[in-house]
Amino acid sequence: MADRRRRRRRASQDSEGEEEEEESGSDSVGSGGESGAPVRQERSEQGNRKAEPPREGKESECESEDGIEGDAVLSDYESADESEIVPTKEVEEAHYNEEEPLKATLKQENNVEEAPAARDQKPKSKGTVTGERQSGDGQESNEPEEDKTIQKSQKQLDDDEDRKNPAYIPRKGLFFEHDLRGHVNDEEVRPKGRHPRKLWKDEGRWVHDRFHEDEQAPKSREELISIYGYDIRSSKNPEEIRPRRPRKPRFSSPSRREENNEKASWPLNRYQDSGDAQPLRPYTNRSAPPSNKVVPSRTYSRQGGYKENRASYQSEEEASLHTYERRQVYGGHRARSSEQGPPPPREFSPEADPIVKEEAVIEKQAAEPSPPPPDRPVEKKSYSRARRSRIKVGDTGKSMEDTTAAELPPPPLMPPAVAAEFTPAPLNVKQGNWEPPAEGGMSGIDEELSQMNLTEQSWNQGQPAYISPRGIPNPMHMGNGPPQYSRMEGMAVQGGRVKRYSSQRQRPVPDPAAMHISLMESHYYDPLQFQGPIYTHGDSSSSMPPQGMIVPPEMHLSHPGMHPHPSPATMSTPNLYPAPVSLPPGQQPPQQLLPPPYFPAPPNVMNFGNPTYPYPPGALPPPPAHLYPNAQAQSQVYGGVTYYNPVQQQVQPKPSPPRRTSQPVTIKPPPPEENRHLKMNEKINS
């Protein structure tokens, strides 16, 4: 501030001197006007001389303000504000440099043209002085005119231009040259002539650098066509561009494949729609007949598609062959699909393979002896009937199965119908798969069961026990695997239908079986508690070994008087029948021979639980010695009945109770919260 005061004093002194000179000049001009022109000229020259020295002095001061002599001037005054004054002067210089050259040129023109007119020149000089002072601080003088110019200059200084203002924006220097804030014209900010400058030299350029400046210009249409074959910028003719796109064939080809897949899958879809076996079943059956392979049904994949209305327990070979033929019968498309070759079985689970192999051996044997041709026509009819009215299917299936059963070699081949019905393949693939002629097959199954009970006791003990009796879904024959109830709901529906064959069922099975059925109705034991052997009493008792016997539902479910009583423990579904225990009248409860096997019986299978009371050993026939040669054997099929080793199966229920107990463990934490709620309620009530 001290500098500014000093400068103001100096400026005020200069301006006062100037004004005095101007006044004297004006007086001389006025006096000379009365005398002659020569005096006027002399005085004007004198006035010029007098006016010039102060103007020169003034210019020198302005120059010092512009920075030529300013450093020296400022260096004379060492003050705290010096650092601030210099940048403000720089900012103001930046703003008013352009005005000063214009003013200088105007001054020269004025000097050349109006030198003779002293009157004009003096005000000009004054104007130039005031204009030049605008480039300074704007505080050069205390005169009212100077004050006006100061106000103007202060108005022109924006907040961002006044360095004392915190909003000041520095615009000088390379760092700020691109700062566009507050600038209307880019030209003011960006240096001119910058763009053409090259940022690198071509001399040290890498050889593989493909960038050429001359190639950066937009290409002409001819060049584009020569390079790309068409004008890539023209969107007017998309047809011309399309053939060059490689995408189009890609789009079309997958669609064709999809169409082919759809065509191939049509027969399967119709098969589903017709309500017949689910699509996977045809696949497994198709593959089965030619290759005689049992589709691995042991993978207990519950694929939700149990078709409840149909219980088909055909032997695998029969079922597969007949389904194969039925497909052909049922429309050209189906025949076509079957001719194309059996599709690979869909669900092939590695776990099932060992079992499948054994079954495959058995069923190959079964397939050879059974002559399919005589059965096929009957089966076709039954198949169509099954589609329309499922109830009648059983009859045709029965006749077919009877013929096949008689022809099959008794021991390993549970009559092919039995093998097929339990062939895990249909079960495995979809547990509704063994559905085709279900009811009809059951009567045939009954007859076959009787034959098997009587004739097939000479069965090879070495045969794997995986061939299950007919009415029992395959999962039952896996000794360890809990049976998958593929058809529980279906059995509930079919309970009434199956009863139609109760008379047939009782033909093969001697009266004791019927008696035991009637007893079953009255005695129901919780299978979890009493799962034990049930023994048929009477002629067939010898053929039916005691241990953990599962009686196919044809034996018992179809009994007209029987109604399922839900046993809470095993009834995973309401259609599951608890294990009834049949006791001959007058006998005290027989003693339990083996620990009760635990496997909830599928609806088709009656699991007869062991009563907790002991069986008298004499009351029941001893179990055949060959039945349990190995305690570890999973299951044995004897006389068409699958026997499970209760020793092994008793282990199965053990894991599940721990699971149940473990669930409460997870539930245990909440009780404190309940206590809290109780406490809160008590507090609220109180």
Swiss-Prot record:
Biased composition (Polar residues): 127-139
Keywords in alphabetical order: Cell projection, Cytoplasm, mRNA processing, mRNA splicing, mRNA transport, Nonsense-mediated mRNA decay, Nucleus, RNA-binding, Spliceosome, Translation regulation, Transport
A GO molecular function held by the record: mRNA binding
Regions of compositional bias (Acidic residues) in chain numbering: 15-25
Subcellular localization(s) per the UniProt record: Cytoplasm; Cytoplasm, Perinuclear region; Nucleus; Nucleus speckle
InterPro entries named among the record's database cross-references: Btz_dom, CASC3
Region ranges (Disordered): 1-419, 646-686
Positions with biased composition (Basic residues): 1-10
Pfam families named among the record's database cross-references: Btz (PF09405)
Highest taxon above the source species: Eukaryota
Ranges annotated as biased composition (Basic and acidic residues): 40-61, 87-102, 174-191, 199-224, 233-243, 319-328, 354-366, 392-401, 671-686
GO cellular component: cytoplasmic stress granule; dendrite; exon-exon junction complex; nuclear speck; nucleus; perinuclear region of cytoplasm; U2-type catalytic step 1 spliceosome
Coarse class of the protein's main subcellular location: cytoplasm
BP GO terms, sorted: mRNA splicing, via spliceosome; mRNA transport; nuclear-transcribed mRNA catabolic process, nonsense-mediated decay; regulation of translation
Family named by the database record: Belongs to the CASC3 family.
PANTHER family noted in UniProt: PROTEIN CASC3 (PTHR13434:SF0)
Complex formation: Identified in the spliceosome C complex. Component of the mRNA splicing-dependent exon junction complex (EJC), which contains at least casc3, eif4a3, magoh, nxf1 and rbm8a. Forms homooligomers.
Task performed by this protein: Required for pre-mRNA splicing as component of the spliceosome. Core component of the splicing-dependent multiprotein exon junction complex (EJC) deposited at splice junctions on mRNAs. The EJC is a dynamic structure consisting of core proteins and several peripheral nuclear and cytoplasmic associated factors that join the complex only transiently either during EJC assembly or during subsequent mRNA metabolism.
Protein name per its UniProtKB record: Protein CASC3
Species this protein is from: Xenopus laevis
Lineage: Eukaryota, Metazoa, Chordata, Craniata, Vertebrata
